Amino acid sequence: MEKLTTITATGVPLRRSNVDTDQIIPAVFLKRVTRTGFDDALFYAWRRDPNFVLNQPEYRDGRILVAGPDFGIGSSREHAVWALHDYGFRVVIASRFADIFYGNTAKNGVLAAIMPQESIELIWKMLEEEPGRQMTVDLETRTVTIDDVVLPFEVNDYVRWRLMNGYDDIDLTLQHEDDIAAYERMRAEKFPFKPKTLPAITEEAETVESAREPEAVEWAGPLADR
């Protein structure tokens, strides 16, 4: 996973609250399990409106999304974060996030930065006054900077550590590769009776008679001639 320490990019003001995961990416697009190819599906219904913020040329290269409170509510689909990341967003700023969505962001290289709503309102105003305005998000100092305005944000220490080091779940697991190998060796020695995968035994196929076509039966009894 790509490390995230400091990013300077165009900020995108999304003046909407209670944005749920179905609005982020509709369920009809959840037929794939890969993490890429979802950029066109992000905010699909809203992007059909020519006045939607992402359709404005000044914001098309935006990588920092500034949204209203309770972002990412609804179903727990991880595709919502995949779509944001695939579009290019590395940071989402809001005053509140849904818990599961917040957890999914850290696993996929997206920072969910928490700021007071008053700070969000100020950022919205500045971004709308000058569309395409650049802003800097610094994980090291936990600050957002726009021109001479510096605003602090909150981020979980563990999430911050993961993002700054670029650790996804697989990276974290591989840090214990030696321990896992040692455990498997111990288990094989201590429990030698554990089931093992054996090659398939090939046997000759048996001939199966059809129940609809029974074998001819010879009757040798006293009524055989009738």
UniProtKB/Swiss-Prot annotation:
Positions of region (Disordered): 204-226
Enzyme Commission numbers on file: 4.2.1.33
Function: Catalyzes the isomerization between 2-isopropylmalate and 3-isopropylmalate, via the formation of 2-isopropylmaleate.
Record keywords, A-Z: Amino-acid biosynthesis, Branched-chain amino acid biosynthesis, Leucine biosynthesis, Lyase
Disulfide bonds: none
MF (Gene Ontology): 3-isopropylmalate dehydratase activity
InterPro entries named among the record's database cross-references: 3-IsopropMal_deHydase_ssu, Aconitase/3IPM_dehydase_swvl, AconitaseA/IPMdHydase_ssu_swvl, IPMI_Swivel, LeuD
Organism, as annotated: Bifidobacterium animalis subsp. lactis (strain AD011)
Transmembrane regions: none
GO biological process: L-leucine biosynthetic process
Catalytic activity reported: (2R,3S)-3-isopropylmalate = (2S)-2-isopropylmalate
Highest taxon above the source species: Bacteria
UniProt cross-references to SUPFAM superfamilies, sorted A to Z: LeuD/IlvD-like
Record pathway: Amino-acid biosynthesis; L-leucine biosynthesis; L-leucine from 3-methyl-2-oxobutanoate: step 2/4
Protein known as: 3-isopropylmalate dehydratase small subunit
GO-annotated cellular components: 3-isopropylmalate dehydratase complex
Pfam families, per the entry: Aconitase_C
Record note on quaternary structure: Heterodimer of LeuC and LeuD.
Keyword Disulfide bond in annotation: no
PANTHER family, per the entry: 3-ISOPROPYLMALATE DEHYDRATASE SMALL SUBUNIT (PTHR43345:SF5), 3-ISOPROPYLMALATE DEHYDRATASE SMALL SUBUNIT 2-RELATED-RELATED (PTHR43345)
Entry's family note: Belongs to the LeuD family. LeuD type 1 subfamily.
